[in-house]
Amino acid sequence: MTEAMKITLSTQPADARWGEKATYSINNDGITLHLNGADDLGLIQRAARKIDGLGIKHVQLSGEGWDADRCWAFWQGYKGPKGTRKVEWPDLDDAQRQELDNRLMIIDWVRDTINAPAEELGPSQLAQRAVDLISNVAGDRVTYRITKGEDLREQGYMGLHTVGRGSERSPVLLALDYNPTGDKEAPVYACLVGKGITFDSGGYSIKQTAFMDSMKSDMGGAATVTGALAFAIMRGLNKRVKLFLCCADNLISGNAFKLGDIITYRNGKKVEVMNTDAEGRLVLADGLIDASAQKPEMIIDAATLTGAAKTALGNDYHALFSFDDALAGRLLASASQENEPFWRLPLAEFHRSQLPSNFAELNNTGSAAYPAGASTAAGFLSHFVENYQQGWLHIDCSATYRKAPVEQWSAGATGLGVRTIANLLTA
């Protein structure tokens, strides 16, 4: 076995021969990362990405200064979708090591699940993976129900059924109940709703190749909220939380939905489909109706919903939308505590009316007259949240996945958002 490369930390600048802005230096003992106090976690993550790029696949984090957050920053940059990597971790106290191990278990699960090819991860497989993960960490405190195919239509889940019926792989709704109280009548504290589109071709509003080639990741919202619930449980979550995953392929076939179709939802809303590539909101609507029926204190939905959010924020931040200023502030505080990037974008009452249809109450996409696509998408979802002005957060997961490597990240999934949502659930 290859001997591990030692990685140490220093608060002293690198020797001038390495350059004025050098973040690491190499000597006979290994590699030293030179912290400057400005953005130490980011520096460690960027250095780890460079170390991986050197082809070094076995490292030992050695010496003073390592804690769980710094170890985790290293792993975020070091991990990649190809090949294997081995890290020998430094000595940490029990609490720090447990936190690190939990992150490695859950957030790596999220990243690996999002990175999985669509051929391997269809709607049923995604739902079952979520069940397996939560059951593994929660045991008998979990019950669940999986509804699929024509049963969805018969039970009124018309958005999910409509989007998913064009694929040979049946659409699936996972309804999972984490109830640590043992009381079947216990109130539901929170509901998590995730978009689980396991491949998105755009349907008849078909995507170009450059926009379709990463669409195995369109289930990133479902993976994120699943990971968040699992991580919160491992952090001691003692309140009842329900998880709803809306899983489907969005494909073209003789049975696929078409432009001009009208979907009638269980809450009476009628939606005209004018863009089959705006399918995520159609499936989330079913999950939000179920979540609202639980009367929880809060509803959090997560979805790789719009390109508009990425246009605004790039892949560097998740976009947050809410009418509830206090709850939005709590999530942003959780994000700050967990060192995860969230940014609040506008959501106002007028966004709810910017989806006009000549044939139904709502259009599933805004017209050219209303170009704030991420905000109008959130406005659409609000029509399916019973008390949308309080206790509801919508996360447009623009930071979930990167098509190409950058300074801090390999190509693929990031796992960002899991810790923030878990923090909010356990606060």
Curated annotation (Swiss-Prot):
Report whether Metal-binding shows up as a keyword of the record. Answer: yes
Which residues bind Mn(2+) 2 per the record?
195, 200, 218, 279
Give the reactions, separated by semicolons, that this protein catalyses: Release of an N-terminal amino acid, Xaa, from a peptide or arylamide. Xaa is preferably Glu or Asp but may be other amino acids, including Leu, Met, His, Cys and Gln
> Which domain of life does the UniProt lineage start with?
Bacteria
Main subcellular location of this protein, as a coarse class: cytoplasm
Q: Name one GO biological process term.
A: proteolysis
Q: Where is the active site?
A: 207, 281
How does the cofactor attach, per the note? Binds 2 manganese ions per subunit.
Q: Which UniProt keywords apply?
A: Aminopeptidase, Cytoplasm, Hydrolase, Manganese, Metal-binding, Protease
Q: Where in the cell is it found?
A: Cytoplasm
Q: Which GO terms describe its cellular component?
A: cytoplasm
Which residues does Mn(2+) 1 bind?
Answer: 200, 277, 279
Could you say which EC number(s) this protein's record lists? 3.4.11.23
Any one Gene Ontology MF annotation carried by this entry is: manganese ion binding
Quaternary structure and interacting proteins, as annotated: Homohexamer.
Q: What does the protein in this record do?
A: Probably plays an important role in intracellular peptide degradation.
The similarity annotation says: Belongs to the peptidase M17 family.
Q: What is this protein called?
A: Peptidase B
Question: Which species is this UniProt entry from?
Answer: Shigella flexneri
